[in-house]
Amino acid sequence: MKIMQLVAAAMAVSLLSVGPARAQFVVSDPATEAETLATALETAANLEQTITMVAMLTSAYGVTGLLTSLNQKNQYPSTRDLDTEMFSPRMPMSTTARAITTDTDRAVVGGDAEADLLRSQITGSANSAGIAADNLETMDKRLTANAETSTQLSRSRNIMQATVTNGLLLKQIHDAMIQNVQATSLLTMTTAQAGLHEAEEAAAQRKEHQKTAVIFGAVP
């Protein structure tokens, strides 16, 4: 029914574009009419295929819920934000990080240099833990989406739907590989962060020793 309606529309447009007749009788050319009809049928078929593809991508029976979660948020800080989030942090950057820093067992009292250093170290570690926690949550969602995609692929009704669904599945696998590399990089950065904390504590102790030495007149 859809094809016949599309053919009728295409034929109407074709007839309107011919222009006014110059004679009082209709001149019929079977070859031209057959070619026009074939073109109209091909145009209608292509249009219906396009409509079907669009409907498949947006309807429930196509790729349910996959397009909305296809491009998931990147949980990792950009290169320019590494210092402010992990190594010289000013504030917690996620809900998990805020929960860690506000725990009463980690409360630091005082406004001296050592207290400021401890607060910065706690915030940096909390931000790292928050990034890892958000990544785990994203991976859980991706695993669920992959399972749904596999199920959708097995229920595909035609080759077009199967091709689109398979493409989405491949993209999710590719994204998971990228996240795995990012997780490895995060592990490397948190190891460096722990080493930096030790160096910062040693530097703070050295400053205190130097201040004490100045008081007693024994500057190294």
From Swiss-Prot:
GO terms for biological process: protein secretion by the type IV secretion system. Residues 1-23 form the signal peptide. One of its GO terms (cellular component) is type IV secretion system complex. Keywords: Crown gall tumor, Plasmid, Signal. Belongs to the virb5 family. VirB proteins are suggested to act at the bacterial surface and there play an important role in directing T-DNA transfer to plant cells. This is Protein virB5. It comes from Agrobacterium fabrum (strain C58 / ATCC 33970) (Agrobacterium tumefaciens (strain C58)).
